[in-house]
């Protein structure tokens, strides 16, 4: 059995670690609330854009935009949103596992996959497994702006415009609540039609002013940007929630470990006292 001094040292070490994890839990909780506010502010815009585009996909358009036309699929692209920091439980790895399964489905059909990464964890993971990373951005902090993440978006849109990609997806964690974050893969291009049953059996004619091509070019690119930005802020809120939960679990586990070590310490101390008493009694008997 370890000595009492060694056990006391272990208890002090766990207590120090517990203070760190408790502080990280509180910081994550504060950041999560701010991230939720940003997410709530941007979500209505992103959802409205999705509805408008879904409505548009059912319309009889006088100008058929490139982003509305289905193609034979030979290569697909993924915009992958991950975190820059760790200590957030299985948030990243669950997302990566889902994406790897999706990519395997395509590669089994002979379709190649390109990856544009947002977040350093995704970059390091997919570089290690041999993924074809064609663009990346990292270190965006806790309050990312669209201008910071537009680089990978432009790379993938250019590839789609030039016919080097036939489908484009965004991969991110959707924030449900503090205890639940769901890895999602959503199609960006070609634009998916709305799944609203009321729209499936209707069609519309649109009038554009001043020019349908210029209007649709701007609108559809803005749609893609809005969905990517929403994916980033949702993933950020998911990250802070997952980190808060992970740090709380670490703090609680530290408390349990301290109790176990305290019990071991008490037993060691009791054994030491018993041994000392035995030695005293033996010495007295010898005299």
Curated annotation (Swiss-Prot):
Taxonomic lineage of the native organism: Bacteria, Pseudomonadati, Pseudomonadota, Gammaproteobacteria, Enterobacterales
Designated name of the protein: ATP synthase gamma chain
Taxonomic source organism: Shigella boydii serotype 4 (strain Sb227)
Gene name in the database record: atpG
Keyword Cell inner membrane annotated: yes
Membrane topology: Peripheral membrane protein
SUPFAM superfamilies (alphabetical): ATP synthase (F1-ATPase), gamma subunit (SSF52943)
Keyword Transport recorded: yes
GO CC annotation: plasma membrane; proton-transporting ATP synthase complex
GO molecular function: ATP binding; proton-transporting ATP synthase activity, rotational mechanism
């Amino acid at each position: 059995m370890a000595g009492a001094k060694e056990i006391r040292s272990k208890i002090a070490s766990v207590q120090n670690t517990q203070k760190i994890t408790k502080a990280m839990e509180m910081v994550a909780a504060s950041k999560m609330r701010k991230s939720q506010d940003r997410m709530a502010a941007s979500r209505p815009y992103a959802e409205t854009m999705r509805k408008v585009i879904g409505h548009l996909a059912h319309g009889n358009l006088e100008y058929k935009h490139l982003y509305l036309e289905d193609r034979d699929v030979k290569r697909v692209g993924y915009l992958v949103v991950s975190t820059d920091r760790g200590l957030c439980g299985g948030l990243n790895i669950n997302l990566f596992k889902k994406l790897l399964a999706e990519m395997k489905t395509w590669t089994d059909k002979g379709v190649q996959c390109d990856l544009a990464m947002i977040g350093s964890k995704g970059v390091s993971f997919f570089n290690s497994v041999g993924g074809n990373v064609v663009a990346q951005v990292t270190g965006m902090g806790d309050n990312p702006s669209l201008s910071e993440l537009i680089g990978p978006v432009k790379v993938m849109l250019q590839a789609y415009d030039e016919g080097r990609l036939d489908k484009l997806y965004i991969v991110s964690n959707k924030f449900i609540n503090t205890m639940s974050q769901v890895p999602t893969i959503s199609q960006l291009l070609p634009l998916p039609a709305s799944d609203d049953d009321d729209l499936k059996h209707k069609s519309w004619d649109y009038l554009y002013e001043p020019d349908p091509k210029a209007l649709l070019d701007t609108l559809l690119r803005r749609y893609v940007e809005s969905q990517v930005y929403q994916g980033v802020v949702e993933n950020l809120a998911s990250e802070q929630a997952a980190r808060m939960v992970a740090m709380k679990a670490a703090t609680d586990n530290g408390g349990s470990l301290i109790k176990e070590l305290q019990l071991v310490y008490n037993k060691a101390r009791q054994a030491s006292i018993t041994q000392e008493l035995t030695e005293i009694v033996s010495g007295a008997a010898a005299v």
